[in-house]
Design a protein with these regions (language model features):
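Active-site entrance/lid segments in N-terminal catalytic domains of soluble metabolic enzymes
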Residues: 1-94, 104
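Glycine-rich phosphate/ribose-binding loops and adjacent secondary-structure elements
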Residues: 60, 64-181
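Conserved small/polar residues in nucleotide/adenosyl-binding loops
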Residues: 184-189
């Protein structure tokens, strides 16, 4: 604790208990999201740990027909690890599947290659959620690759500071040249 130095252990079970206590509609399993690395062995160990935590999270979650429990696919930029992670999660059984460990330093091309490599293996009848992605080009590219859901602080942060995204690029809507502009932002740039 930052208050008194007391140690707290956040286990997969405790994470589920907290999220249920918050009355979350979608509950996420605990996972380990390693830095963007090319170290296959490190990514594999992290993926295996995340799969074990997903199993424990599912047991802790129990059956709840009014809430959704999402598994988080890990595996870095390695297609075989992503597919193995996804298959582990499918075997456990979840209401939806999130893709974690992307948008953490890799290029957009690398992110799209991961999505292209896994999209045909993801259950079509379940929601597909790409975590931490919020730029318009990332969202559009991910939707083309079968992703349904996104979350990111960037759109809110951008809007709060007056940054608007248009088909012609970003504009700072608070600039004086837009003071009397009556055009939609998509026409303003």
């Amino acid at each position: 604790s930052h208050i008194d130095g007391k140690t707290f252990i956040l286990s997969p079970e405790e994470s589920i208990r907290i999220q249920k206590g918050l009355n979350s509609d979608i509950v996420m399993v605990m996972d380990e999201c390693p830095k963007n690395t090319k170290d296959y062995d490190k990514i594999q160990k992290s993926m295996e740990l995340s799969s074990e935590w997903a199993r424990r999270s599912k047991v802790s979650f129990g059956t709840n027909n009014h809430k959704g429990l999402f598994g988080i696919v890990q595996g870095g930029l390695f297609k075989d690890l992503r597919i193995k992670s996804l298959n582990n999660l499918i075997d456990i059984g979840f209401n939806g599947y999130a893709l974690g460990g992307l948008a953490v330093g890799e290029t957009q091309i690398e992110m799209f290659e991961v999505l292209d490599g896994i999209k045909d293996f993801m259950p079509k009848e379940k929601p597909r959620y790409l975590m931490g992605v919020g730029t318009p080009s990332d969202i559009l590219g991910a939707v083309k690759r079968g992703i349904d859901m996104f979350d990111c602080v960037m759109p809110t942060r951008s809007g709060r500071t007056g940054l608007a995204f248009t088909w012609n690029g970003q504009i700072q809507i608070r600039n004086s040249k837009y003071k009397n502009c009556l055009l939609y932002t998509s026409d303003a740039a």
